[in-house]
From Swiss-Prot:
Keywords: Bacterial flagellum, Cell outer membrane, Lipoprotein, Membrane, Palmitate, Signal
Name of the protein described by the UniProt record: Flagellar L-ring protein
Compartments in which it is found: Cell outer membrane; Bacterial flagellum basal body
GO biological process: bacterial-type flagellum-dependent cell motility
Domain of life where this protein originates: Bacteria
Entry keyword annotation includes GTP-binding: no
Organism: Stenotrophomonas maltophilia (strain K279a)
Amino acid sequence: MSPISNFARIALACTVAALLGGCVIAGDVRPYPAMAPIQPIMPPQAEPTAGAIYAAGPTLQLYSDRRARDVGDLLTITLLENTTAQTSANTATNKESNLSLGTPSILGAPVTLGGKDILSATAKGARDFTGKGNSAQSNRLQGSVTVTVIQRLPNGNLVVQGQKNLRLNQGDELVQVQGIVRPGDISQDNTIPSSRVAEARIVYGGRGPVAQSNAMGWLSRFFNSGLTPF
């Protein structure tokens, strides 16, 4: 066997191995999108007026609790998210066509050749299509994330943002939370459930072997995409 044939076989084997590896190897599943840290925008502090009895300054509440109300305060959001979605679609089409041309006649006599009709024709056609799809998804997320008040809106609502990074064994876990909360919904222990957060964006993701094992390879994604003609 010639060296060229051996090289061609080795190259073909390497190509097939790479394609098969694409079915099982995938890159890291990264959270969407990476949230850059934002420093709280502190409101300008008024300078005290020398010689006056009253001097403007930060709010001092003698009898209030420690609930978040100003920029830079911390707030704990309790994550209690449960979502369930299910969809089903069925499509069926059927079309039939029939065409029949009878034997023409001349002066009342049919046109034949050897006693057989030569100008008559019959055509039939039928098309059927059936499609069916089902999708079901259920998600549950529980935990807590302490966020920072980054802005106080004119109506008193608070814009909050925060994230939590965990490194467990060989994987990284990331939880990001952004949204708007109403001070009246904050409990006395300075916590609020995630269901009370408006414009909420809650992201949970990870990187590592566990995330890779749940990701589909690029070749598998191709055969499950709309690019395939099947």
